């Protein structure tokens, strides 16, 4: 479970990550990473639009992504990071394992984990 202190909730934080952060994409996801000078722990947020599917599909996709992200928090820098995971339409039909592979690939492309790290 992704604890409250690690959840990204405010519009301004999403904007910083989406507009000013580095970006890495896969077929199903786009990851946005920004480093802030705040003394907050690294926080993760999700954007799952109607393009992904209906309400049930969107919520299922977000739950899967939240579970994957919670398992990757230990590989991310401890303080000041904002990670936004934006789901593309193909994410709606992806399994949890496929989403995990895409998150790991995006984190490697952003330089946040070493090659081979975070798999699992």
From Swiss-Prot:
It catalyses: Endonucleolytic cleavage of RNA, removing 5'-extranucleotides from tRNA precursor. One of its GO terms (cellular component) is ribonuclease P complex. Pfam families: Ribonuclease_P. InterPro entries: Ribosomal_Su5_D2-typ_SF, Ribsml_uS5_D2-typ_fold_subgr, RNase_P. GO terms for molecular function: 3'-tRNA processing endoribonuclease activity; ribonuclease P activity; tRNA binding. Its EC number is 3.1.26.5. The keyword RNA-binding applies. It comes from the Bacteria. The keyword Protein biosynthesis does not apply. It is an enzyme of class 3 (hydrolase). Keywords: Endonuclease, Hydrolase, Nuclease, RNA-binding, tRNA processing. GO terms for biological process: tRNA 5'-leader removal. RNaseP catalyzes the removal of the 5'-leader sequence from pre-tRNA to produce the mature 5'-terminus. It can also cleave other RNA substrates such as 4.5S RNA. The protein component plays an auxiliary but essential role in vivo by binding to the 5'-leader sequence and broadening the substrate specificity of the ribozyme. Consists of a catalytic RNA component (M1 or rnpB) and a protein subunit. Belongs to the RnpA family. This is Ribonuclease P protein component. It comes from Kineococcus radiotolerans (strain ATCC BAA-149 / DSM 14245 / SRS30216). The lineage of its organism: Bacteria, Bacillati, Actinomycetota, Actinomycetes, Kineosporiales. The gene is rnpA.
């Amino acid at each position: 479970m992704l604890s409250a202190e690690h959840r990204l909730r405010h519009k301004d934080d999403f904007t910083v990550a989406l507009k000013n952060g580095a970006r890495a994409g896969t077929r199903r996801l786009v990851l946005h990473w920004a480093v802030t000078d705040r003394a907050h722990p690294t926080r993760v947020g999700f954007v799952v639009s109607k393009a992904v599917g209906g309400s049930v599909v969107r919520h299922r996709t977000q739950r899967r992504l939240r579970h994957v992200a919670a398992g990757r928090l230990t590989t991310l820098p401890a303080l000041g990071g904002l990670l936004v995971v934006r789901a593309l339409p193909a994410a709606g039909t992806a399994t949890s394992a496929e989403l995990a592979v895409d998150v790991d690939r995006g984190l490697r492309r952003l330089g946040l984990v070493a090659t081979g790290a975070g798999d699992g």
